[in-house]
Protein backbone atom coordinates (compact mmCIF):
# COMPACT_ATOMS: atom_id res chain seq x y z
CA UNK A 1 0.00 0.00 0.00
CA UNK A 2 3.02 2.30 -0.27
CA UNK A 3 1.71 3.69 -3.55
CA UNK A 4 -1.39 4.93 -1.73
CA UNK A 5 0.80 6.72 0.83
CA UNK A 6 2.87 8.22 -2.00
CA UNK A 7 -0.29 9.66 -3.55
CA UNK A 8 -1.40 11.07 -0.18
CA UNK A 9 2.01 12.72 0.17
CA UNK A 10 1.84 14.14 -3.36
CA UNK A 11 -1.56 15.73 -2.72
CA UNK A 12 -0.41 17.16 0.62
CA UNK A 13 2.60 18.74 -1.08
CA UNK A 14 1.18 19.69 -4.47
CA UNK A 15 -2.61 19.72 -4.23
CA UNK A 16 -4.41 22.97 -4.89
CA UNK A 17 -6.57 24.55 -2.22
CA UNK A 18 -10.22 24.58 -3.29
CA UNK A 19 -13.69 25.14 -1.91
CA UNK A 20 -16.11 22.21 -2.13
CA UNK A 21 -19.76 21.23 -1.81
CA UNK A 22 -19.45 20.42 1.91
CA UNK A 23 -17.87 23.83 2.69
CA UNK A 24 -15.00 22.02 4.43
CA UNK A 25 -12.35 22.89 1.86
CA UNK A 26 -9.90 20.50 0.23
CA UNK A 27 -6.43 20.02 -1.18
CA UNK A 28 -7.18 18.58 -4.62
CA UNK A 29 -5.32 16.96 -7.51
CA UNK A 30 -6.77 15.60 -10.75
CA UNK A 31 -6.08 12.35 -12.56
CA UNK A 32 -4.16 9.58 -10.77
CA UNK A 33 -4.02 5.78 -10.81
CA UNK A 34 -3.07 3.00 -8.40
CA UNK A 35 -2.68 -0.71 -9.22
CA UNK A 36 -2.88 -3.61 -6.78
CA UNK A 37 -2.09 -7.23 -7.67
CA UNK A 38 -4.32 -9.34 -5.43
CA UNK A 39 -1.92 -12.25 -5.84
CA UNK A 40 0.45 -10.24 -3.61
CA UNK A 41 -2.11 -10.06 -0.79
CA UNK A 42 -5.37 -8.29 -0.11
CA UNK A 43 -4.95 -4.49 -0.41
CA UNK A 44 -6.10 -3.51 3.06
CA UNK A 45 -4.56 -0.33 4.44
CA UNK A 46 -2.22 -1.10 7.37
CA UNK A 47 -0.99 2.39 8.27
CA UNK A 48 -4.26 2.86 10.13
CA UNK A 49 -7.00 0.43 11.10
CA UNK A 50 -9.40 -0.51 8.29
CA UNK A 51 -13.11 -0.68 9.17
CA UNK A 52 -13.36 -4.14 7.60
CA UNK A 53 -16.84 -5.01 8.84
CA UNK A 54 -18.04 -1.73 7.40
CA UNK A 55 -16.47 -2.61 4.05
CA UNK A 56 -18.07 -6.05 3.89
CA UNK A 57 -21.50 -4.94 5.08
CA UNK A 58 -21.71 -2.06 2.59
CA UNK A 59 -20.74 -4.27 -0.35
CA UNK A 60 -23.26 -6.97 0.63
CA UNK A 61 -25.87 -4.21 0.92
CA UNK A 62 -25.03 -2.89 -2.55
CA UNK A 63 -25.23 -6.40 -3.97
CA UNK A 64 -28.70 -6.83 -2.46
CA UNK A 65 -29.84 -3.78 -4.40
CA UNK A 66 -31.14 -2.00 -1.30
CA UNK A 67 -31.96 1.71 -1.02
CA UNK A 68 -32.54 1.64 2.76
CA UNK A 69 -29.79 2.65 5.19
CA UNK A 70 -31.46 0.65 7.98
CA UNK A 71 -31.00 -2.52 5.92
CA UNK A 72 -27.28 -1.73 5.87
CA UNK A 73 -27.42 -1.43 9.67
CA UNK A 74 -29.08 -4.87 9.88
CA UNK A 75 -26.26 -6.42 7.86
CA UNK A 76 -23.54 -4.56 9.77
CA UNK A 77 -24.81 -5.23 13.31
CA UNK A 78 -26.58 -8.55 12.62
CA UNK A 79 -29.76 -7.48 14.38
CA UNK A 80 -33.29 -6.67 13.22
CA UNK A 81 -33.99 -3.01 12.53
CA UNK A 82 -36.37 -2.91 15.48
CA UNK A 83 -33.31 -3.57 17.67
CA UNK A 84 -31.30 -0.80 16.01
CA UNK A 85 -33.29 2.29 16.97
CA UNK A 86 -30.49 3.73 19.13
CA UNK A 87 -28.87 5.65 16.29
CA UNK A 88 -25.98 6.90 18.40
CA UNK A 89 -24.95 3.27 18.82
CA UNK A 90 -26.12 1.77 15.53
CA UNK A 91 -25.36 4.36 12.86
CA UNK A 92 -23.55 3.61 9.58
CA UNK A 93 -21.51 5.67 7.13
CA UNK A 94 -24.78 6.33 5.25
CA UNK A 95 -26.86 7.53 8.21
CA UNK A 96 -25.98 11.21 7.80
CA UNK A 97 -26.74 11.11 4.08
CA UNK A 98 -30.15 9.61 4.79
CA UNK A 99 -30.89 12.10 7.57
CA UNK A 100 -29.80 15.11 5.51
CA UNK A 101 -29.96 14.72 1.74
CA UNK A 102 -32.49 11.88 1.93
CA UNK A 103 -34.85 13.99 4.04
CA UNK A 104 -34.36 16.99 1.71
CA UNK A 105 -35.45 14.78 -1.18
CA UNK A 106 -38.59 13.78 0.73
CA UNK A 107 -37.70 10.14 1.38
CA UNK A 108 -39.04 8.11 4.30
CA UNK A 109 -36.92 8.63 7.39
CA UNK A 110 -37.57 7.08 10.79
CA UNK A 111 -35.85 4.91 13.38
CA UNK A 112 -36.53 1.82 11.26
CA UNK A 113 -36.56 3.10 7.65
CA UNK A 114 -34.11 5.55 6.04
CA UNK A 115 -34.47 5.72 2.28
CA UNK A 116 -31.67 7.06 0.09
CA UNK A 117 -33.15 6.92 -3.39
CA UNK A 118 -31.77 5.00 -6.40
CA UNK A 119 -28.15 4.79 -5.20
CA UNK A 120 -25.41 2.27 -6.08
CA UNK A 121 -27.16 -0.98 -5.25
CA UNK A 122 -30.35 -0.02 -7.05
CA UNK A 123 -28.40 0.84 -10.20
CA UNK A 124 -26.34 -2.35 -9.97
CA UNK A 125 -29.36 -4.63 -9.59
CA UNK A 126 -32.27 -2.75 -11.20
CA UNK A 127 -31.27 -0.07 -13.72
CA UNK A 128 -34.52 0.31 -15.66
CA UNK A 129 -35.24 -3.37 -15.07
CA UNK A 130 -31.69 -4.50 -15.94
CA UNK A 131 -29.72 -6.50 -13.37
CA UNK A 132 -26.20 -5.38 -14.18
CA UNK A 133 -24.55 -7.84 -11.80
CA UNK A 134 -26.25 -10.86 -13.35
CA UNK A 135 -25.59 -9.59 -16.88
CA UNK A 136 -21.96 -8.95 -15.97
CA UNK A 137 -21.53 -12.51 -14.70
CA UNK A 138 -23.28 -13.97 -17.73
CA UNK A 139 -21.10 -11.92 -20.07
CA UNK A 140 -17.88 -12.91 -18.32
CA UNK A 141 -18.88 -16.57 -18.58
CA UNK A 142 -20.03 -16.57 -22.19
CA UNK A 143 -17.53 -14.11 -23.66
CA UNK A 144 -14.61 -13.73 -21.25
CA UNK A 145 -12.43 -11.90 -23.80
CA UNK A 146 -15.12 -9.28 -24.45
CA UNK A 147 -14.60 -5.56 -23.90
CA UNK A 148 -18.10 -4.71 -22.68
CA UNK A 149 -17.90 -6.07 -19.14
CA UNK A 150 -19.04 -2.82 -17.53
CA UNK A 151 -20.73 -2.03 -14.21
CA UNK A 152 -22.05 1.53 -13.91
CA UNK A 153 -23.82 3.49 -11.19
CA UNK A 154 -23.99 6.81 -13.09
CA UNK A 155 -27.61 6.85 -14.22
CA UNK A 156 -27.94 10.41 -15.52
CA UNK A 157 -31.73 10.34 -15.38
CA UNK A 158 -31.70 9.43 -11.67
CA UNK A 159 -28.77 11.51 -10.33
CA UNK A 160 -31.06 14.18 -8.89
CA UNK A 161 -33.04 11.53 -6.99
CA UNK A 162 -30.00 10.10 -5.17
CA UNK A 163 -29.12 11.15 -1.63
CA UNK A 164 -25.50 10.98 -2.82
CA UNK A 165 -24.56 10.70 -6.51
CA UNK A 166 -22.04 7.91 -7.14
CA UNK A 167 -18.42 8.69 -6.31
CA UNK A 168 -17.16 5.39 -7.74
CA UNK A 169 -18.90 5.72 -11.05
CA UNK A 170 -17.98 2.81 -13.27
CA UNK A 171 -15.85 -0.32 -13.38
CA UNK A 172 -14.69 -2.60 -16.18
CA UNK A 173 -13.72 -6.25 -15.81
CA UNK A 174 -11.07 -8.12 -17.79
CA UNK A 175 -10.34 -11.84 -17.97
CA UNK A 176 -6.70 -12.69 -18.70
CA UNK A 177 -5.83 -15.79 -20.68
CA UNK A 178 -4.14 -17.10 -17.51
CA UNK A 179 -7.54 -17.33 -15.80
CA UNK A 180 -7.37 -14.18 -13.70
CA UNK A 181 -10.13 -11.60 -13.35
CA UNK A 182 -9.08 -7.95 -13.08
CA UNK A 183 -11.09 -4.79 -12.48
CA UNK A 184 -10.52 -1.11 -13.20
CA UNK A 185 -12.73 1.37 -11.35
CA UNK A 186 -13.11 5.07 -12.12
CA UNK A 187 -13.82 7.29 -9.13
CA UNK A 188 -14.90 10.83 -10.01
CA UNK A 189 -14.57 12.12 -6.42
CA UNK A 190 -12.16 10.54 -3.95
CA UNK A 191 -11.77 11.40 -0.26
CA UNK A 192 -8.20 10.18 -0.10
CA UNK A 193 -7.88 9.94 3.67
CA UNK A 194 -11.22 8.57 4.87
CA UNK A 195 -12.86 7.08 1.81
CA UNK A 196 -10.24 5.67 -0.53
CA UNK A 197 -8.81 2.91 1.73
CA UNK A 198 -12.44 1.78 2.18
CA UNK A 199 -13.06 1.94 -1.60
CA UNK A 200 -9.90 -0.03 -2.41
CA UNK A 201 -10.90 -2.81 -0.02
CA UNK A 202 -14.51 -2.79 -1.25
CA UNK A 203 -13.63 -3.23 -4.92
CA UNK A 204 -10.92 -5.77 -4.14
CA UNK A 205 -13.60 -7.73 -2.26
CA UNK A 206 -16.10 -7.35 -5.13
CA UNK A 207 -13.43 -8.57 -7.54
CA UNK A 208 -12.70 -11.54 -5.26
CA UNK A 209 -16.38 -12.47 -4.95
CA UNK A 210 -16.99 -12.33 -8.70
CA UNK A 211 -13.81 -14.31 -9.39
CA UNK A 212 -14.94 -16.93 -6.87
CA UNK A 213 -18.34 -17.28 -8.55
CA UNK A 214 -16.68 -17.60 -11.97
CA UNK A 215 -13.98 -20.06 -10.81
CA UNK A 216 -11.27 -17.55 -11.70
CA UNK A 217 -8.35 -16.18 -9.70
CA UNK A 218 -8.40 -12.51 -8.67
CA UNK A 219 -5.91 -10.48 -10.67
CA UNK A 220 -5.33 -6.72 -10.53
CA UNK A 221 -7.50 -3.99 -9.09
CA UNK A 222 -6.76 -0.75 -10.91
CA UNK A 223 -8.06 2.38 -9.17
CA UNK A 224 -8.36 5.45 -11.41
CA UNK A 225 -9.16 8.84 -9.87
CA UNK A 226 -10.67 12.05 -11.16
CA UNK A 227 -10.74 14.63 -8.34
CA UNK A 228 -8.50 13.14 -5.63
CA UNK A 229 -8.67 15.30 -2.53
CA UNK A 230 -7.85 15.55 1.16
CA UNK A 231 -10.37 17.49 3.23
CA UNK A 232 -8.82 20.27 5.25
CA UNK A 233 -10.22 18.80 8.46
CA UNK A 234 -8.10 15.68 7.91
CA UNK A 235 -4.81 17.20 6.71
CA UNK A 236 -3.02 16.65 10.02
CA UNK A 237 -4.28 13.07 10.16
CA UNK A 238 -3.00 12.41 6.62
CA UNK A 239 0.37 13.87 7.57
CA UNK A 240 0.52 11.45 10.51
CA UNK A 241 -0.44 8.49 8.34
CA UNK A 242 2.32 9.00 5.76
CA UNK A 243 4.95 8.76 8.53
CA UNK A 244 3.91 5.18 9.30
CA UNK A 245 5.55 2.13 7.77
CA UNK A 246 3.17 -0.25 5.93
CA UNK A 247 2.84 -3.77 7.32
CA UNK A 248 2.49 -7.06 5.44
CA UNK A 249 -0.75 -7.43 3.50
CA UNK A 250 -3.30 -9.95 4.80
CA UNK A 251 -4.96 -12.83 2.94
CA UNK A 252 -8.70 -12.81 2.25
CA UNK A 253 -10.49 -15.91 3.53
CA UNK A 254 -14.02 -16.26 2.19
CA UNK A 255 -16.60 -19.01 1.61
CA UNK A 256 -17.14 -20.70 -1.73
CA UNK A 257 -19.86 -18.72 -3.49
CA UNK A 258 -21.74 -20.22 -6.42
CA UNK A 259 -23.98 -17.25 -7.25
CA UNK A 260 -24.83 -13.74 -6.13
CA UNK A 261 -27.97 -15.17 -4.52
CA UNK A 262 -25.72 -17.33 -2.31
CA UNK A 263 -24.56 -14.20 -0.49
CA UNK A 264 -27.78 -14.12 1.51
CA UNK A 265 -26.59 -17.31 3.22
CA UNK A 266 -23.48 -15.62 4.62
CA UNK A 267 -22.77 -12.91 7.16
CA UNK A 268 -19.98 -10.35 7.40
CA UNK A 269 -18.16 -12.74 9.75
CA UNK A 270 -17.65 -15.18 6.86
CA UNK A 271 -15.22 -12.76 5.19
CA UNK A 272 -11.95 -12.63 7.12
CA UNK A 273 -8.64 -10.83 6.61
CA UNK A 274 -6.22 -13.48 7.83
CA UNK A 275 -3.00 -12.07 9.25
CA UNK A 276 -4.22 -8.46 9.22
CA UNK A 277 -2.14 -6.20 11.43
CA UNK A 278 -2.31 -2.43 11.40
CA UNK A 279 -1.17 0.72 13.10
CA UNK A 280 -3.78 2.34 15.41
CA UNK A 281 -6.85 4.04 13.99
CA UNK A 282 -6.63 7.71 13.02
CA UNK A 283 -9.99 9.43 13.41
CA UNK A 284 -11.23 12.34 11.30
CA UNK A 285 -14.70 13.85 10.77
CA UNK A 286 -16.61 12.86 7.65
CA UNK A 287 -17.58 15.71 5.34
CA UNK A 288 -21.22 15.27 4.30
Describe each model-derived feature in a short phrase.
Residues 1-288:
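Terminal, non-catalytic protein-protein interaction segments that mediate quaternary/complex assembly
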